[in-house]
Swiss-Prot record:
Main localization (coarse): cytoplasm
Residues annotated as signal peptide: none
Compartments where located: Cytoplasm, Nucleoid
Keyword Chaperone applies: no
Entry GO CC: cytoplasm; nucleoid
InterPro entries from the UniProt entry: MraZ, MraZ_C, MraZ_dom, MraZ_N, MraZ_sf, SpoVT-AbrB_dom, SpoVT-AbrB_sf
SUPFAM superfamilies (alphabetical): AbrB/MazE/MraZ-like
Family annotation (Gene3D superfamilies): Transcriptional regulator MraZ domain
Gene this chain is encoded by: mraZ
Name of the protein in question: Transcriptional regulator MraZ
Length: 143
């Protein structure tokens, strides 16, 4: 399970060091794609395959389903690590996530998210203010 929060920097060549704990869980190749709230999501290949299967079951007749599928699949890239444990973030993904030098990598269960530090701080501040209400709304999920 991917968990934790890590602060890293994106270098001038758009390379990002991934925490060693996450590299060990990802394997040799993995998928990075556009995600919600101007973030990116990295899936181990086996988790991506499961997710992609679910995407392929979305009804083509539903406009929102088509939009979600297009957005995620068009932004997806297969990636691997260099010898220093870095990945290259392509321009299209970098722009989507509004990444600059300061980046936050957050564990998210079956994968991890990549955020600009500014966006992450704004998101977590809002979530912290509403956390009790969010938790209450999730009682139906038996957490």
């Amino acid at each position: 399970m991917f968990m934790g929060e890590y602060q890293h920097t994106l270098d001038d060549k758009s390379r990002l060091i991934i925490p060693a704990k996450f590299r060990n869980q990802l394997g040799d190749t993995f998928v990075v794609t556009r995600w919600m709230e101007h973030s990116l999501f990295a899936f181990p290949k086996d988790e991506w395959d499961k997710f992609e299967e679910k995407l392929n079951k979305l009804p083509f007749g539903a406009k929102d389903a088509r939009a979600f599928r297009r957005f995620v699949l068009a932004g997806a890239i297969e990636s691997d690590f260099d010898k220093q444990g870095r990945i290259i973030i392509p321009t299209v993904l970098k722009e989507h996530a509004q990444l600059n030098k300061n980046v936050v990598i957050t564990g998210s269960g079956n994968g991890f998210e990549i955020w600009s530090k500014d966006n992450w701080e704004e998101y977590t501040a809002g979530t912290a203010e509403n956390f009790d209400q969010i938790a209450e709304e999730l009682t139906d999920f038996d957490l």
